[in-house]
Amino acid sequence: MGSAGLEQTKARLHINCAQPATRTWQRKFDDEGKKIEQFSMTMNDMISIIPLILKGLMVNADQMGKGRDIQYDPFRKWMDNCYRGLPIGGLGAGSIGRSYRGYFQHFQIFPALYEEKPILANQFSAFVSRPNGKSYSTVLSAPTADALKGVDKATIGSWDWKLKEKNCTYHALFPRSWTVYDGEPDPEIKITCRQISPIIPHNYKESSFPVAVFTFTVQNSGRTPADVTLLFTWANSVGGRSELTGNHTNSKMIRW
């Protein structure tokens, strides 16, 4: 369906992509959330899971003996955080997570490969210019200070990471979400990003497509026209010579 057909369909169905649903889960970008803490176990709990641990180790040893990568490594430290929003993608098609702070994280596309940290190259950015010469630009996400720590200032570190978090709100109602940038980067511009994954009632086949749609709506409340440019960047998500620069890895499930 072309852009004209899409607009006709939205008009017929009375879809306003810039308006979040009335009942949504909401978070401000500057919301620190509730930090995830490790739970403790009693001695009885530890004793009760010994058979499960032994079975898991036996399965891993069997997989390694057959030349396959193990599905779950109990000795690996998993990173988790409280910033997760809705996942992207259809049912059973793997997923790419998205934080309520605007960035992509928790990649789970290939079996046994989990990329939990945000890939900083995967971003939406906005550039605004007006006839009076004023211009504004920013990356439309707010990674934590830890995510930006150690980033090369000559590459991704040179991007405009100056989003005012208090002006941005995330709304979620599965399978949709809305990210509203009110006054960002231009004080008189409002940008709404609508995300939707293909969850179609009674249609499992097309609900399993590994796709998602992002629709942007820009509203100008100023008295002068604005030239708004949206940029989408994405690092190599499959592998190859550039995979390491995007924090990606290649791994064989079976050694031939």
Residue ranges and their predicted role:
Residues 91, 98-101, 109-112, 131, ...:
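An acidic- and aromatic-residue-enriched active-site/binding cleft used to recognize and process polar
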Residues 85, 92-94, 178, 215, ...:
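Beta-sheet entry/capping signal
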Residues 198-256:
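Polysaccharide-binding surfaces and accessory modules of carbohydrate-active proteins
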Residues 2-145:
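Beta-strand-rich N-terminal accessory domains
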Residues 10, 153-156, 245:
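Soluble extramembrane domains flanking the early transmembrane region of eukaryotic membrane proteins
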Residues 145-211:
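Extended, loop-rich substrate-binding clefts of extracytoplasmic carbohydrate-active enzymes
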Residues 69-73, 77-82, 110-112, 162-165, ...:
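Short alpha-helical segments and helix-capping/turn motifs at coil-helix boundaries
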Residues 95-97, 104-107, 188-192, 202-203, ...:
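Short helix/loop capping segments that flank catalytic or ligand/cofactor-binding pockets
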